[in-house]
C-alpha cells in the first residue's frame, strides 16, 4: 500500500515549556497530519536523555522521557494545581540545562500527590511494567545519589549489584524510586492518550529504537552478562562505524556491544521483550543500524577513534527468525544505510522488512552507493533526508556546485525549486512509504538541522517556530493525492 508521512521529533514541537511535549501541540500536529492526508508520524526515540542530549543514548531502552510530560495535562488530571504550572516561555531551541534544573522540582509535586494515594491505574501500570520499571527507577535514584556519575564510575558494590548493597539502596532510596516510577506513569498515560487520538484520526506512529543501549543505562546495569563486559561491568569492546568518505576516523559511538552467543542461548528473550514493548507503544518500529545484526563493527574499549576496529559476525538469520516468531513479519522498518555487504542484503531480504532510501544521497558524489530513484524497490521507505541529514535547502546551500547541478538536471528543476522537486521525487517513486521531514515541507535551511553526526553542541535542539497553516496542509494533501499515497481508509 502506498502511503506517506512526516518526520517530526516530539521535542521539536512548539509549546510553552521549553521543549515539545505530549500536550495540545502534539494533538494539533495529529490534526495537521490528518488534514494533509498523511498516514504516518515518524518520531525519534522517546527515552530519557542524559549528557549530550541524544535520544540515541538513553538511560533506558524501555522508559519515556520526563521532559515530554505536559504540565497542563498533569493539572487537568489533578496532579498539579493551576498555579504550579510554569508560565509560558517563548518557543526557541531546546535548553536542556534549564529543563534539567526545572523539571524534577515540578514533577515531584505531581508525583507526591499521586503517591499519597496511589490510584489503581498507577498500581496496574507498575505491575504491567515490572520487567523494567523497578530496575530503572533504582538506577535513576542511585545515579542521583552518585552525583549523576556514569555507571562505570559507581562504587564496585553498586555497579556490580551486590545483593546487600542493592537491598540497602532500596531502603535508603525508597522515596526516590517511587518518584521515578510515578514519572513513568505520567509519561505513558499521556503517550497512550496521544497514540489513541492519532489512531482515531487515521495516523500511525512510527517509533525509532537504537540498536544499542547506552553505556550509562539501566539495561547494561541490570543484565551486564548480555553485553561484552568484564566481570566488573566494564566494557571490553564498544560500537561504532569504520572510516568512510564522511568521517576519516570513523565514528566512535562507545555503546556496549551485545554478547550475541548469550542472547542466542536465551532465545533472544531480552530482544523479544524489547520489541514487544516497542510494538505496544508504536504502530511501526524503525530499528536503527539494522546491518549490525548481520555483522557489527567492534572497537577495543579505550580507543580514541574508530580506526582500530574490526567487523565481527552477528546473529544474522537466527535473530530474524526469533523476531518473526515473536512479532510476525510486519511493522518493522530496517535502517540499512551505510556499508552493505551481500550478506547484509541477504539478511534484509530474508526479514521481509523494508529498507531505507535517502534521496539526498542519490546526488552526493561522496556516497558510494546508488540511491537514484530508478534503483528503488516497492518494499522500501524513501526520505529526502533523515534527522542525520541537513535539510534539503541546507543541502542545496552546502553541497558542491557539481552535485547541485546534477540533482537539478536529474529532477528537471532550478536550484530554487530543488526542495519541492526532491519531495515530489520521493512521493512519486515506487517505494511503498515516503517520509518527508517537516523542515523540508517548510523549506527551512540548515538552522533546522536536527543532528550532525560525530559532533556535540547544537544537536537535538531544533523546534518548530513556523506556523503550520491549513494552506500548507492542503498543499501536502494535493501532492499526496496526486501521487496516490492517500490513507487506506479513503
Task: Give the positions of each predicted feature.
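Mature N-terminal, pre-catalytic/accessory segment of carbohydrate-active enzymes
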Residues: 1-37
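Outer-envelope exported proteins of Gram-negative bacteria
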Residues: 44, 204-206, 210, 284, ...
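Conserved, well-ordered alpha-helix/loop/beta-strand core segments that scaffold catalytic motifs
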Residues: 180-213
Amino acid at each position: 500500500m502506498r502511503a506517506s508521512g512526516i518526520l517530526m521529533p516530539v521535542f521539536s514541537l512548539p509549546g510553552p515549556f521549553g521543549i515539545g511535549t505530549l500536550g495540545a501541540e502534539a494533538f494539533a500536529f495529529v490534526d495537521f497530519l490528518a488534514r494533509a492526508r498523511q498516514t504516518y508520524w515518524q518520531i525519534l526515540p522517546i527515552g530519557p536523555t542524559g549528557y549530550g542530549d541524544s535520544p540515541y543514548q538513553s538511560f533506558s531502552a524501555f522508559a519515556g522521557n520526563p521532559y515530554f510530560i505536559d504540565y497542563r495535562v498533569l493539572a487537568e488530571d489533578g496532579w498539579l494545581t493551576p498555579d504550579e504550572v510554569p508560565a509560558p516561555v517563548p518557543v526557541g531551541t531546546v535548553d536542556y540545562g534549564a529543563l534539567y534544573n526545572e523539571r524534577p522540582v515540578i514533577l515531584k509535586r505531581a508525583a507526591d500527590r499521586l503517591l499519597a494515594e496511589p490510584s489503581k491505574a498507577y498500581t496496574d501500570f507498575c505491575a504491567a511494567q515490572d520487567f523494567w520499571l523497578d530496575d530503572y527507577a533504582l538506577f535513576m535514584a542511585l545515579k542521583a545519589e552518585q552525583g549523576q556519575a556514569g555507571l562505570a564510575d559507581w562504587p564496585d558494590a553498586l555497579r556490580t549489584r551486590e545483593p546487600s548493597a542493592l537491598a540497602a539502596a532500596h531502603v535508603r532510596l525508597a522515596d526516590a524510586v517511587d518518584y521515578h516510577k510515578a514519572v513513568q506513569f505520567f509519561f505513558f498515560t499521556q503517550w497512550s492518550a496521544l497514540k489513541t487520538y492519532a489512531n482515531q484520526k487515521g495516523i500511525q506512529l512510527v517509533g525509532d529504537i537504537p540498536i544499542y543501549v547506552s553505556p550509562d543505562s539501566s539495561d547494561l546495569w541490570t543484565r551486564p552478562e548480555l553485553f561484552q563486559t568484564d566481570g566488573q561491568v566494564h566494557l571490553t569492546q564498544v560500537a561504532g562505524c569504520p572510516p568512510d568518505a564522511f568521517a576519516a576516523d570513523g565514528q566512535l559511538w562507545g555503546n556496549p556491544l551485545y554478547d550475541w552467543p548469550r542472547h542466542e542461548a536465551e532465545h533472544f528473550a531480552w530482544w523479544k521483550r524489547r520489541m514487544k514493548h516497542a510494538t505496544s507503544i508504536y504502530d511501526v518500529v524503525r530499528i536503527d543500524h539494522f546491518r549490525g545484526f548481520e555483522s557489527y563493527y567492534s572497537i577495543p574499549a579505550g580507543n580514541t577513534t574508530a580506526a582500530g576496529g574490526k567487523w565481527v559476525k552477528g546473529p544474522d538469520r537466527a535473530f530474524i527468525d526469533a523476531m518473526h516468531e515473536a512479532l510476525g513479519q510486519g511493522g518493522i522498518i530496517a535502517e540499512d544505510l551505510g556499508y552493505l555487504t551481500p550478506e547484509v542484503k541477504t539478511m534484509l531480504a530474508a526479514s521481509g522488512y523494508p529498507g531505507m532510501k535517502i534521496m539526498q544521497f542519490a546526488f552526493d558524489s561522496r556516497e558510494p552507493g546508488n540511491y537514484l530513484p530508478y534503483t528503488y524497490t516497492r518494499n522500501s521507505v524513501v526520505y529526502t533526508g533523515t534527522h542525520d541529514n541537513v535539510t534539503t535547502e541546507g543541502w542545496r546551500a552546502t553541497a558542491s556546485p557539481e552535485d547541485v547541478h546534477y540533482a537539478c538536471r536529474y529532477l528537471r528543476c532550478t536550484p530554487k525549486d530543488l526542495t519541492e522537486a526532491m519531495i515530489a521525487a520521493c512521493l512519486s517513486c515506487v517505494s511503498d512509504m515516503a517520509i518527508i521531514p517537516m523542515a523540508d515541507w517548510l523549506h527551512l535551511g540548515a538552522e533546522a538541522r536536527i543532528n550532525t553526526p560525530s559532533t556535540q553542541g547544537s544537536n537535538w535542539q531544533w523546534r518548530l517556530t513556523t506556523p503550520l497553516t491549513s494552506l500548507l496542509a492542503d498543499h501536502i494533501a494535493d501532492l499526496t493525492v496526486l501521487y496516490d499515497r492517500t490513507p487506506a481508509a479513503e
